[in-house]
């Protein structure tokens, strides 16, 4: 039987979502599979909606897995969470259709990037906030970011390690706002390239400080040259909010579009 899980995690202590072999360091995937396998009393493999890098967090990562073990969804949720480290929790578990796929059934994915904009670096929230000491104009950043909307070639915001076959993605929404001392960037797309969100944020910061004009983002997009764009923003400010699926899959409302 196939199940879908909603998983929350603090990525600070992990080398990323993906299990990278025996000597690849701790991963969220390996921890989750070990816990599920213990509950099932048999090996369990999971497939996720979107892989995250080292230090990046997940608010509602969605995974699917198959198991012949007879467990109620609540049993999977509570039993798995009890076997996970404190930095990972299963938020919900529901039965899924046999043809549901956490990655390929998703219609969109959402990320949030938050950075503390003040002279003094964060102490209390240093693992979940990035930091920029220079004053940022969030309105200018928001205006510049709108040039990225639509289906475009995002080569200028793609890491050199990216293994995607092409750089075309459909950016459905991007919003920048200031909330007190925090500048927040929320972005939604059909899919993302490796480091795409962090590279966009790194370039928007240069607009926010006034180092670059607002139309620079459009110029970068058209130029498709990663070497002239802004630096990659640090990982700790990034959260994978989660994917969105069509209602036909009958998943919880927070991941249904």
From Swiss-Prot:
It is an enzyme of class 5 (isomerase). The keyword tRNA processing applies. InterPro entries: PsdUridine_synth_cat_dom_sf, PsdUridine_synth_TruA, PsdUridine_synth_TruA_a/b_dom, PsdUridine_synth_TruA_C, TruA/RsuA/RluB/E/F_N. Keywords: Isomerase, tRNA processing. It comes from the Bacteria. It catalyses: uridine(38/39/40) in tRNA = pseudouridine(38/39/40) in tRNA. This is tRNA pseudouridine synthase A. It comes from Xanthomonas axonopodis pv. citri (strain 306).
């Amino acid at each position: 039987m196939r199940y879908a899980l909603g998983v929350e995690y603090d990525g600070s202590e992990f080398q990323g979502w993906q299990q990278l072999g025996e000597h690849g360091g701790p991963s969220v995937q390996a921890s989750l599979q070990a816990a599920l396998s213990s509950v099932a009393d048999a090996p369990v493999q999971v497939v996720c909606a979107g892989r995250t890098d080292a230090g990046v967090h997940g608010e509602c990562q969605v995974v699917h897995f198959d198991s012949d073990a007879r467990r109620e969804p609540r049993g999977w949720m509570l039993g798995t969470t009890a076997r996970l480290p404190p930095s990972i929790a299963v938020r919900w578990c529901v039965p899924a259709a046999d043809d549901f796929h956490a990655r390929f059934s998703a219609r969109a994915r959402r990320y949030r990037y938050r950075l503390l904009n003040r002279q003094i670096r964060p102490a209390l929230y240093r693992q979940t906030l990035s930091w920029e000491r220079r004053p940022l104009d969030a309105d200018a950043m928001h205006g510049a970011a709108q040039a990225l909307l639509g289906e475009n070639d995002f080569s200028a915001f793609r890491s050199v390690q990216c293994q995607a076959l092409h750089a075309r993605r459909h950016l459905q929404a991007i919003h920048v706002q200031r909330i007190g001392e925090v500048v927040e960037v929320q972005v939604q797309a059909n899919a993302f390239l490796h480091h795409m969100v962090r590279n966009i944020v790194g370039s928007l910061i240069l607009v926010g400080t006034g180092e670059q004009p607002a139309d620079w983002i459009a110029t970068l997009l058209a130029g498709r040259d990663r070497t002239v764009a802004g630096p990659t923003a640090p990982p700790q400010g990034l959260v994978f909010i989660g994917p969105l699926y069509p209602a036909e899959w009958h998943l919880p409302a927070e991941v249904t579009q």
